[in-house]
C-alpha cells in the first residue's frame, strides 16, 4: 500500500492521472525511497506505463556497421581507439546488414538499429548507411533506426530522406557529470544533434548509462534533461565495466538503485518509450528484469549488444510470454 502523503501519493495524482512528469526535486524523493517501498514504486510505474503508453512491448535488434577505432574517449566504451581494449575496428558490408535485419525481424522485432563507432560520419559512412537502409527496406518489413554520432543539418536531412525513422544519440549522463565521462566533445554538441533530428521529423532516441559514478542528484538531473527533449525513446543502460577502459574497475550498480531509477525515469517521462538496453543482465538478473518489465519498461533490445553479450533472444521472448506482455506489431503506413 502506498503511504498517503508520500511522493508516490503525489505521483499518483500528478503523473498517473494528469500525465505530468515529476520535477527534479520530486525525482530525488523517488530515488531515495526506502527498500520496502520499491514494490509500490514498480506497481505505480507500471500503471503509468499502461495508461500513457499502452500494454505492448517494442522489440529491437541492433548491429554495429563499424566497430572499434573510435577517436572519442567515452570512459565506459571499449570501442574507443584511445584505450587498450580488446575491441578492434571492423566494418560490415550491406549484404550482412540485410541478413542481420532479416534475422531480427524473425524475432518479431519492429525496429533494426544500425550503429557505428565514430564521432560523426564521413562521406563513406553516410553513403553506406543510405544504401543499407534502402536495401533493408526493399527486402525486410522492419523500421530502420541509426546511431552514427554527431550530425550536421545536411547529414540529418539525408538520413531522413533515406528512410531512417528514428535517430539515437545518447546524452549519456547529466550535463553536470558529462566532463567526468567524456573529454573529447561536449554535452552541448550531443544536444545540438538531437535538436536537428527533431527538426527533420525523425523520432528522437536519447538515453544513457546509469551507475557510472554519478550522484543521485545528477541522476535526477539527467532524467529531467532527457524529459526536456520530449524523446520518443529513452534507452536505459547500466554500466558493464569493460576491460581496458577508465571505468573498468567501477562496481556494478546496486539492483535496488537500478529499480528505483527505472521507476523514477518512468515517472519523469510518462509518455516516453523506456527501453531496456545494455547491462541489465548483470545489474538486475532475471528477477530484476521481470520486475522492471512490470515497473515502467516498455521496450527491449534483444540479442547481443555492440561489444557485450546479452541474453539469448529466445530467453527474453519467453520471459515476455511468461509475463503475458504483448510484443508490438509493425504497422506500415501507406
From Swiss-Prot:
EC class name: transferase
GO MF terms, alphabetically ordered: 2 iron, 2 sulfur cluster binding; 4 iron, 4 sulfur cluster binding; biotin synthase activity; iron ion binding
Pathway where it operates: Cofactor biosynthesis; biotin biosynthesis; biotin from 7,8-diaminononanoate: step 2/2
Protein residues bound to [2Fe-2S] cluster: 113, 205, 275
Cofactor binding annotation: Binds 1 [4Fe-4S] cluster. The cluster is coordinated with 3 cysteines and an exchangeable S-adenosyl-L-methionine.
Pfam families, sorted: BATS (PF06968), Radical_SAM (PF04055)
Family matches, as CDD domains: Radical_SAM
Keyword Iron-sulfur: yes
Residues that bind [4Fe-4S] cluster: 70, 74, 77
Keyword line: 2Fe-2S, 4Fe-4S, Biotin biosynthesis, Iron, Iron-sulfur, Metal-binding, S-adenosyl-L-methionine, Transferase
EC number per UniProt: 2.8.1.6
Keyword Zinc-finger listed: no
Domain Radical SAM core, first and last residues per copy: 55-280
Top-rank taxon, per record: Bacteria
Catalytic reaction list: (4R,5S)-dethiobiotin + (sulfur carrier)-SH + 2 reduced [2Fe-2S]-[ferredoxin] + 2 S-adenosyl-L-methionine = (sulfur carrier)-H + biotin + 2 5'-deoxyadenosine + 2 L-methionine + 2 oxidized [2Fe-2S]-[ferredoxin]
Requisite cofactors: [4Fe-4S] cluster; [2Fe-2S] cluster
Role of this protein: Catalyzes the conversion of dethiobiotin (DTB) to biotin by the insertion of a sulfur atom into dethiobiotin via a radical-based mechanism.
PANTHER family for the chain: BIOTIN SYNTHASE, BIOTIN SYNTHASE, MITOCHONDRIAL
HAMAP family for this protein: BioB
UniProt subunit comment: Homodimer.
Name under which the protein is recorded: Biotin synthase
Gene designation: bioB
Amino acid at each position: 500500500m502506498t503511504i498517503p502523503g508520500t511522493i508516490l501519493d503525489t505521483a499518483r495524482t500528478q503523473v498517473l492521472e494528469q500525465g505530468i512528469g515529476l520535477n527534479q526535486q520530486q525525482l530525488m524523493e523517488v530515488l531515495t525511497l526506502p527498500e520496502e517501498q520499491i514494490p509500490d514504486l514498480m506497481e505505480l510505474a507500471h500503471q503509468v506505463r499502461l495508461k500513457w503508453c499502452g500494454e505492448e512491448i517494442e522489440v529491437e535488434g541492433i548491429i554495429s556497421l563499424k566497430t572499434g577505432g573510435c577517436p572519442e574517449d567515452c570512459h565506459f566504451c571499449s570501442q574507443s581507439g584511445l584505450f587498450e581494449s580488446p575491441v578492434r575496428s571492423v566494418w560490415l558490408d550491406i549484404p550482412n546488414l540485410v541478413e542481420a535485419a532479416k534475422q531480427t525481424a524473425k524475432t518479431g522485432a519492429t525496429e533494426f538499429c544500425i550503429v557505428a563507432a565514430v564521432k560523426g560520419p564521413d562521406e563513406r559512412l553516410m553513403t553506406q548507411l543510405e544504401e543499407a537502409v534502402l536495401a533493408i527496406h526493399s527486402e525486410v518489413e522492419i523500421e530502420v533506426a541509426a546511431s552514427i554520432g554527431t550530425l550536421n543539418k545536411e547529414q540529418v536531412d539525408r538520413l531522413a530522406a533515406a528512410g531512417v525513422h528514428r535517430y539515437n544519440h545518447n546524452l549519456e549522463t547529466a550535463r553536470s557529470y558529462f566532463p567526468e565521462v567524456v573529454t573529447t566533445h561536449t554535452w552541448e554538441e550531443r544536444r545540438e544533434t538531437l535538436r536537428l533530428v527533431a527538426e527533420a521529423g525523425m523520432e528522437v532516441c536519447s538515453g544513457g548509462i546509469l551507475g557510472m559514478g554519478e550522484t543521485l542528484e545528477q541522476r535526477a538531473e539527467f532524467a529531467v534533461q532527457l524529459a526536456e527533449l520530449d524523446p520518443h525513446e529513452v534507452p536505459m543502460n547500466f554500466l558493464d565495466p569493460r576491460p581496458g577502459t577508465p571505468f573498468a574497475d567501477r562496481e556494478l550498480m546496486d539492483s535496488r538503485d537500478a529499480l528505483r531509477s527505472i521507476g523514477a525515469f518512468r515517472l519523469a517521462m510518462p509518455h516516453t518509450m523506456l527501453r531496456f538496453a545494455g547491462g541489465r543482465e548483470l545489474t538486475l538478473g532475471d528477477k530484476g528484469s521481470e520486475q522492471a518489465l512490470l515497473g515502467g519498461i516498455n521496450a527491449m533490445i534483444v540479442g547481443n549488444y555492440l561489444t557485450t553479450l546479452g541474453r539469448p533472444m529466445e530467453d527474453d521472448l519467453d520471459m515476455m510470454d511468461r509475463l503475458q506482455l504483448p510484443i508490438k506489431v509493425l504497422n506500415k503506413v501507406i
